[in-house]
């Protein structure tokens, strides 16, 4: 078969998407959710078990042998990106698997581009998915500040929702720039 990069590019082209889309890797990296009853493949945790088991940790099988995909690496060559944005996704199961691939964290830290993250937690709740539940089960408060702490060694700035404006100074105390704005897109006007 084709590589994930080739398949992703074919889908991008079919949908007429102009922007390049770079998968993290063409290698298999599998997220394993650790629970008191033993490890679960992420698909079993998320779909079969509907995120009900208590989370005690995560493993990213295959990450240590994986390499960044060619377009991912190419994005950091030459002048590199103008900016890197960590979207408001689950830090543990969406972003950490990418950071677990050897060389990715180094590429990000070596880049001259500013790097910002948008909080997936608004008012103590996840916008969607099990992020808040996972944070609580891992012994951390489900707050935007805790997400900022998770990324603090990697990012330059953090975007908070207006509902969490009260932690602005604490996030700045981590050495990060802060933007407080409406981050929740409820209507078409919000999305445009």
What are these regions (language model features)?
Residues 1-9, 13, 20, 123-129, ...:
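Glycine-rich nucleotide/cofactor/substrate-binding loop typically near the N-terminus or early
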Residues 1-62:
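Electropositive, gly/pro-rich neighborhoods at or near active sites that engage anionic ligands
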Residues 53-77:
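Active-site glycine-rich loop that binds ribose-phosphate moieties when present
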Residues 63-65, 90-101:
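Active-site glycine- and acidic-residue-rich loops that bind
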Residues 73-83, 108-111:
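Glycine-rich phosphate/diphosphate-binding loops that line cofactor/substrate pockets in enzymes
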Residues 82-85, 114, 157:
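Structural motif
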Residues 99-138:
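Redox- and metal-dependent alpha/beta enzyme cores, enriched for Fe-S-associated oxidoreductases
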Residues 128-192:
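C-terminal functional extensions of proteins
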């Amino acid at each position: 078969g084709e590589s994930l990069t080739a398949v992703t590019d074919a889908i991008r082209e079919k949908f007429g998407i102009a922007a390049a889309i770079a998968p993290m890797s063409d290698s298999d990296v599998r997220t394993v959710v650790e629970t008191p009853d033993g490890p679960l493949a992420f698909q079993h945790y998320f779909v079969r078990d509907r995120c009900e088991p208590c989370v005690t940790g995560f493993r990213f099988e295959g990450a240590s042998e994986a390499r960044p995909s060619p377009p991912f690496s190419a994005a950091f060559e030459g002048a590199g990106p103008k900016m890197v944005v960590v979207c408001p996704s689950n830090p543990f199961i969406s972003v950490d698997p990418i950071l677990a691939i050897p060389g990715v964290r180094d590429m990000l830290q070596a880049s001259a581009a500013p790097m910002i993250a948008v909080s997936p937690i608004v008012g103590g709740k996840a916008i969607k998915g099990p992020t808040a539940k996972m944070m609580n089960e891992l012994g951390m408060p489900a707050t935007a500040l805790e997400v900022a702490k998770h990324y603090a060694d990697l990012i330059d700035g953090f975007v908070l929702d207006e509902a969490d404006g009260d932690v602005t100074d604490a996030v700045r105390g981590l050495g990060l720039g802060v933007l407080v704005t409406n981050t929740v897109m409820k209507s078409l006007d919000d999305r445009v």
